[in-house]
Amino acid sequence: MLAKRIIPCLDVKDGKTVKGINFINFRDAGDAVELGRQYSKQGADELVYLDIIASHEERKTFIELVKKVAANINIPFTVGGGINEMQDVDRLLNAGADKISVNSAALRNPSLIEDIAKNFGSQVCVVAIDAKLEADGQWLCYLNGGRIPTNQYLFKWANEVESRGAGEILFTSITHDGVKNGYANEVLSALTGSLHIPIIASGGAGKQEHFRDAFIIGKADAALAASVFHFGEMNIKVLKNYLWRKGISIRN
């Protein structure tokens, strides 16, 4: 069995890490490079940096940040936010990123997934899917950080993403994001059962048991979290020791 991964996520605005609830109400969580360095020392397997503004000016700041992160940490990291074309991918990989996460741009232009996989390899292409459980019981995909509903449903889109060559999927439940009541394990389990690429669980981590459940019930390959790490509620080394004691294959 492949070891499960613990991945802190850093949402970046003006070079600072911020965190919100249900994708709104952001608060400052600290320096993005320093936090990344701390997580690397604590034993994080990977990091994800998301540029949540992604304006033209912010893009320059973000590329400089990616260079600093690459110079200061020794674990793989994924970057996303505002990636719309191959030129953006090229710039960020050249700045030192290991993987690229695309979300809204892939929904608008699915061939971007194939282009990234073909030019840089599937392992570089992470497709982020933000979905919300609707009143009719369906999981609907959203654009622009959870603000704009689409006509795409989660399972249909996830299967298309895999068929177009994505290396893994980062699935965030908007319904669960930031409220710390656990991951969307039922839908995670259905996703992992229907796909052949790794699924990263995101949205809902509040305590150690939530990570355990994401791996055992949700069958996720990795679990991503933000606020529990940023605000010192949970130490990654302590979390990994807990998971290991629960019989979960984890890198120490």
From Swiss-Prot:
Catalysis: reaction(s): 5-[(5-phospho-1-deoxy-D-ribulos-1-ylimino)methylamino]-1-(5-phospho-beta-D-ribosyl)imidazole-4-carboxamide + L-glutamine = D-erythro-1-(imidazol-4-yl)glycerol 3-phosphate + 5-amino-1-(5-phospho-beta-D-ribosyl)imidazole-4-carboxamide + L-glutamate + H(+)
Pathway: Amino-acid biosynthesis; L-histidine biosynthesis; L-histidine from 5-phospho-alpha-D-ribose 1-diphosphate: step 5/9
UniProt xrefs under InterPro entries: Aldolase_TIM (IPR013785), His_biosynth (IPR006062), HisF (IPR004651), IGPS_HisA/HisF (IPR050064), RibuloseP-bd_barrel (IPR011060)
Keyword terms: Amino-acid biosynthesis, Cytoplasm, Histidine biosynthesis, Lyase
Known EC number: 4.3.2.10
GO molecular function per UniProt: imidazoleglycerol-phosphate synthase activity; lyase activity
Compartments where found: Cytoplasm
Stored CDD domains: HisF
GO annotation, cellular component aspect: cytoplasm
Alphabetical GO biological process terms: L-histidine biosynthetic process
Family: Belongs to the HisA/HisF family.
NCBIfam families for the chain: hisF
Free-text function comment from the UniProt entry: IGPS catalyzes the conversion of PRFAR and glutamine to IGP, AICAR and glutamate. The HisF subunit catalyzes the cyclization activity that produces IGP and AICAR from PRFAR using the ammonia provided by the HisH subunit.
Protein name: Imidazole glycerol phosphate synthase subunit HisF
Record organism: Azobacteroides pseudotrichonymphae genomovar. CFP2
